[in-house]
């Protein structure tokens, strides 16, 4: 018994030694837990998993049930995209954040972004729909670099008012330059009703942002049709560093983590010689899970890039390549 008593005293000393250090670590750390449906295997039973395997395709089964998903498709629409080269992790001004008392309410806003300039205008790509998304960037080094610094999204029934609210909460109080250049879908292949809806959505977002004091210039209205091969080729040029007329692109992997994930999962599809961005994931994945798993956020990025830089390499994009005939408009 004496041996047990002494061992308890020894263990208590070890605990008292480490408790302050562990408490300090907890205040500056995040607990990450990853779990799958197999945690409840005893309750759900084998029949549940058999039914799900028969009902879902393999990608959905691995993602939804097993918490396993593809990290990258083989044939990417963003062919030259390299996360080591085109993503950055030094997102925040940590000196400012660490001075705060994190026990009090803390809201991460643009003022804590290392690469945000409150005096520069914001470039915004917008993909409307039941899943609506914004991708926000700023040009650096006199236009030689484009940094994508933030993503926003919402799902139906939330629409433009919710996107504008999120945008204002993040940028509103910190921005001196209130100018936004908004690049929505060019909608080359849309029916007239769809085109009118996109125009309506874009103008509604413009109105909501302006209600918060931003000055919004709406681009892309009435411009020429954009084809899949043109977008694909522009992305090849931009992410491949093949043109001095185009900026280097860097994406914040902390504030745009869904965009970074979804770019790697955006497949190129060829049908009878036609090249397309395969958007089938937008129909397969539930709305609430689409941010990092579908082509929604990458589409918003494409609208921004083509709207902003397509005219800079017009000669490269004005003639259809011989090996990509009869491509579809989007």
Could you describe each region identified by the protein language model?
Residues 144-286, 311-312, 328-330:
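Mg2+-dependent endonuclease catalytic cores in nucleic-acid-processing enzymes, primarily RNase H-like
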Residues 1-43, 48:
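ASCE P-loop NTPase helicase motor core
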Residues 132-138:
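Short beta-strand scaffold segments in enzyme catalytic cores
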Residues 10-28, 84-106, 208-210, 238-243:
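Short, conserved catalytic or adaptor-binding loops enriched in Gly and charged residues
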Residues 305-330:
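Acidic two-metal-ion nuclease catalytic site recognized across multiple nuclease folds
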Residues 36-125:
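ATPase catalytic-site recognition across NTP-hydrolyzing enzymes
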Residues 67, 265, 298-307:
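Short, hydrophobic/amphipathic alpha-helical patches that form generic packing surfaces
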Residues 126-131:
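A short acidic Gly-Thr/Ser loop motif
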